[in-house]
Amino acid sequence: MARLNPSKPSSRGGKPRSSSADAMAEHKPPPGRPKREGEGASKKKAKSGGFESMGLCEEVYRGVRHKGYRVPTPIQRKAMPLILAGHDIAAMARTGSGKTAAFLVPMIQRLRRHDAGAGIRALILSPTRDLATQTLKFAQQLGKFTDLKISLIVGGDSMESQFEELAENPDIIIATPGRLVHHLAEVEDLNLRTVEYVVFDEADSLFSLGLIQQLHDILHKLSDTRQTLLFSATLPQALADFAKAGLRDPQIVRLDLDKKISPDLKLAFFTLRQEEKLAALLYLVRERISSEEQTIIFVSTKHHVEFLNILFREEGLEPSLSYGAMDQEARNIHISKFRARKTMILIVTDVAARGLDIPLLDNVVNWDFPAKPKLFVHRVGRVARQGRSGTAYTFVTSEDMAYLLDLHLFLSKPLRPAPTEEELLKDMEGMNLKIDRALANGETVYGRFPQTIIDLVSDGIREVINGCTDLIALEKPCTNAFHLYLKTRPMPSTESIRRVKDLPREGLHPIFRDVLGSDELSALAFSERLKSFRPKQTILEAEGEAARGSNQWLDVMKKKREVHEGIINLVHQKNNVDHEPKEELVENISNWERKDVCGNKRKLQSFRDEEYYISSVPQNQHLEAGLSVRANEGFVENRLDAAVLDLVDDETSGMQAQKTRYHWKKNKFVKLNSGDRVTATGKIKTESGAKLKPTKTGIYKKWQQKTHRSIDTGRKYGGFAEEGASTTGSHQRGNRKHTAAGRGRRYIPNADVPSEIRNPEQIQKSRQQKAMDIARMKNRSTKESKFQKFQKNNRRHDGPSKDGKFQKNRRPDGNGKNRRPDGNGKGRGKGKGNANGFGKGKGKMKGKGTR
């Protein structure tokens, strides 16, 4: 019995009901029941500019209210209307501003209901597993009142379980590029041509050189009519790096350019040596950070994660940890414990720097200074979210000072050193008031970590390390890994390297003002003066003068030093004079004498009209350089690439030759696109750092044979339907689908699927065909049995007899013996017939017999 379709026209000739009418009838409350909160929210137009004014359907609006949103954030208010209108956008806003909801809410509003025959309709790509898992949970919460199916495709999980999810025809896929490329190579039936909505979350990280090959394979399988969205907290203004994303007339939304980090975030930079970081970290965790506050610690390598994990456990602290090569189940367990506040410390690498949203996070500690300014923004963006305050502690060594200057050029924030101990002893109240005003104005103050504290904590750490064999075994791998990290990180800018040499000496950081008293400050000032002490005599002179008193050789050394000091002072005076203004040299000279000095010709002077002056360097040069996708390679490679001028050849052969590059390992020329790099083995690098070949391994076929299921996402069927219609509001006439609204035509999957209901003629024809096939098979089996019987009898014939008839004899030689009854052995005997059973002869004969 066929199921009634409410969207079909009635037999009375009435007009078909549209999908919007069905939705209104479905959600209309029964009489006598008051409306629930949020019911009919898509109709009313609130003046407050909330989600009610965006035209969301009831299911989506209820999900938004259930999540706790009341008023959209600036990025949501700016981007969501453009997305709902169908525009491609590239959006940038600082971390914690609600970018995830800005693309999830329009996606759920567009899809609304599950459609098993439409295939995959939305694809969200994330650079890391943690970010993809977080996006999945967020999408499930927003789509709680819809029946949309969402699938998570990330590395670390079993392929078979992901095959099960794909076989259920999900509407939305949230994936990492490496695992999705693996599925595309493994499953031939997996089709992405039906995708209408594509989101690149953290787009600048996705389009970096590490993942560009995977994205190229994915984008090649997408439809050209898709809607493409780029979201990131650090997105450059020039979209040339995202040319392969296929943006069509994109709308650029960039908010909070002057506030790249939260204004509620406090920054603290401590200068110290590399070997002092352990003591400084333990002191911060124990003394400065409350036990009720959650802290995330960023380190450079996974070896440092393991080392700090064991050290903290030896000290009585239980941390959670996460890094790229860690098992996915273990990562989920550690992150879940940290979210549930069972542990208060999380030690991670930069795999958790992007997009990881942990509620109620209070502090961030940067063990190693990030080499890229935007990486620092992503790290510290984990705290001070949604109106909460937080603190970011950063350790800075002497090699990291140039990166510190680059960071503040990117943030457009002034940087000043903390006052020295001598300045504090002279005017402590005035210096403290000056520092407080600088911090209130948004300036960054960096200073030293107290040496007395480091000395006290370092002794205890050394005892713990010497008593633990695991820590001793991890010391050398940590050192080697850190050296490799220093070699591979990008170089800072040349200007910052030059400016570091002119920076003044910093004092104690203001955060430790309440720790040290005036006596300790005096001791620190004395120790700092000892560091700058330079004796006037060499050790030989001092010992000689103490032993023998004044003599001729000591007098010669003193006279030599006096002469040299005079020359040195003259050089210093000359350098100081060169830096003074030239006008001071002729200040007291008459006009006539001035002409002799300066000349009669007027000198060329510099003049700049600020209103009409056009600089050769853009004002936001440091900002865009830090936001650039190619910034991962450092400033040197960017400048070299910008200085190269490639002229396109005027012949086809020359154009093709320009796109090829000789590969040393493959021993041939390979074809490259713009921005692509040569890979030695053709392997792809996943988000965990593992390398694998995107080739078919046969695991999908094994899963098919085991479960007798397959993945079919609309690869075989597809058609066109009218523009503006959805699959839920369409009706079917014959083998075509028609919609209720719109005159244009657009591609809708499975629109031309033939009906499976057969008429009596088709049933009769199929039965006749089946009967004919059965009769043909019976006839064939009868003929085969006769032929087999004939062959069996023919094996027993040994040859013709005298009268020409075949005589049956199981001995192929006629009369002799045969050791192999099947006729393949050697036969001996007398009589007529040879070893094959057909010839004539007398005497003994040898030969191979055949059947």
UniProtKB/Swiss-Prot annotation:
Helicase C-terminal domain segment(s): 277-426
Composition bias, Basic residues: 733-746, 841-851
Protein name: DEAD-box ATP-dependent RNA helicase 29
Occurrences of domain Helicase ATP-binding (ranges): 80-253
Sequence motif: DEAD box, positions: 201-204
Residues at which ATP binds: 93-100
Record field: compositional bias (Basic and acidic residues): 24-42, 773-787, 796-825
Root EC class: hydrolase
CDD domains from the UniProt entry: SF2_C_DEAD (cd18787)
SMART domains listed in its UniProt record: DBP10CT (SM01123), DEXDc (SM00487), HELICc (SM00490)
Similarity section: Belongs to the DEAD box helicase family. DDX54/DBP10 subfamily.
Chain positions of motif Q motif: 49-77
UniProt GO cellular component terms: cytosol; nucleus
Region (Disordered), start-end ranges: 1-49, 702-851
Listed Low complexity bias regions: 7-20
EC number: 3.6.4.13
Keywords tagged on the record: ATP-binding, Helicase, Hydrolase, Nucleotide-binding, RNA-binding
A GO molecular function held by the record: ATP binding
Keyword Phosphoprotein among record annotations: no
Entries under Gene3D superfamilies matching the protein: P-loop containing nucleotide triphosphate hydrolases
Catalyzed reactions: ATP + H2O = ADP + phosphate + H(+)
Domain notes: The Q motif is unique to and characteristic of the DEAD box family of RNA helicases and controls ATP binding and hydrolysis.
